[in-house]
Amino acid sequence: MKSLVLLLCLAQLWGCHSAPRGLGLIYRQPNCDDPETEEAALVAIDYINQNHPWGYKHTLNQIDEVKVWPRQPSGELFEIEIDTLETTCHVLDPTPVARCSVRQLKEHAVEGDCDFQLLKLDGKFSVVYAKCDSSPDSAEDVRKVCQDCPLLAPLNDTRVVHAAKAALAAFNAQNNGSNFQLEEISRAQLVPLPPSTYVEFTVSGTDCVAKEATEAAKCNLLAEKQYGFCKATLSEKLGGAEVAVTCTVFQTQPVTSQPQPEGANETVPTPVVDPDAPPSPPLGAPGLPPAGSPPDSHVLLAAPPGHQLHWAHYDLRHTFMGVVSLGSPSGEASHPRKTRTVVQPSVGAAAGPVVPPCPGRIRHFKV
């Protein structure tokens, strides 16, 4: 009898250690197109667009999988996998992502893949973990829909850099306001016929007057940040190059005093990195955040890549590297995949094929 009691105690002890701390033993798998699942996915999309410092906003394309874990003493943890698509709105553009156009296949679309964990507490979602990567569509797939469409070019290609600088000079020459400096080359394509370079880039306003500025080095960025987004084409002609440029200047952004991590205000170069290089470490010391930290405090952002090497787009993996946020449910990295008990959503008996709950619908197109 004593042996039986001891065996039962050991079994209970093993069960306690095998479950993730702070999470229940049973998870549920709602439908990927349920309103609650989509709400969680849209919070994840907002998180990407609010924290990705370079390139373009992303929009939700498909929800691949979702698991919901009960969390002790309250709340639920949503583990969700989503596919995203790049839009034509830059991350500095204040336009809501719902009003941004998705970049089409013939324009050389970019797809993102993300794993998120979101804590739902008192009806509100907050991100506690984010890991993403993104990549342009293959050249073969672009050629299938448009044989002559140009592909993405490396952002530091000499022709691209020359086109961006020439376009900025042309914009400043016809601008009666502040002188603008080049902030980031965001996207570029080399067009074979007619020979031309298409480039998109961002600019930032300075305290110099455009018509009077002679040395950019003597100009300082405005205290209230003012950014603009430009599209330009530099065409090669017999008589020389011809530049066509249009810029949209966004409203100034007031300075807000917020606590910053150590080294956050240091000047960093325009991020263009080698895709084969290892990812930069995240800001702050590696390791797990302390328990009891504010749920809206995050340490997910990576240090900006600093090497100007061949790179055609700003990969999400350099920003969302899978570091646990300070708002993690237990203050540590959770691993809910260890527990395999699952509760499927109830489905009544009905004639016809059973539709799997996941993956969900494709909102735009598959890359």
Swiss-Prot record:
Q: How is it modified after translation?
A: Phosphorylated by FAM20C in the extracellular medium.
Q: Hey, what's the signal peptide range on this chain?
A: 1-18
Could you tell me which species this protein originates from?
Pan troglodytes (Chimpanzee)
Q: Which domain of life is it from?
A: Eukaryota
- This chain belongs to the protein called Alpha-2-HS-glycoprotein
Domain called Cystatin fetuin-A-type: residue spans:
27-133, 144-255
Please list the residues that make up the propeptide: 301-340
Q: How does it assemble?
A: Alpha-2-HS glycoprotein derives from this precursor, when the connecting peptide is cleaved off. The two chains A and B are held together by a single disulfide bond.
Keyword terms, alphabetized:
Disulfide bond, Glycoprotein, Mineral balance, Phosphoprotein, Repeat, Secreted, Signal
Q: Which residues carry this modification: Phosphoserine?
A: 134-135, 138, 325, 328, 330
